Amino acid sequence: MTIATLAKPKKSTPLLFEGLTWREFKAVEQLLDRPGYRLSFLDGILEIRQMPGETHETVKKRLAALLELYLLMAGFDFTPTGSMTLESEGGAVKREADESYKLAPGRSRPDLAIEIVFTSGGLNKLESYKRLKI
């Protein structure tokens, strides 16, 4: 058996802009609606990141495949919701997971989110999902 290793991803530092209101964030979001960038927002801070590369996608897809196999074998009636964008004006948060899942029928939002993280810095992802009740 051969063990394959993945190349180290390029380090990408997010751009952070502080002191925005939700309304200002939504205006900036419309202006920056371009392929290749992912915007997140938490507590008045806008984070702009370049879309992840091949290594990130490989790890994401492999982890998702393992999780989906487990959910099938465990008998969950789950729905993959992909990189669904989630936001809450009241919680002052917007986040887009790498992958997400509803673990039972009839749910309005995902129960589980997958984030593949190679670098530190940026917004507190766990706090974002906590506010989104995921």
Task: Pin down the residues of each PLM region.
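Gly/Pro/Ser/Thr-rich low-complexity, intrinsically disordered segments predominantly at protein N-termini
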Residues: 1-132
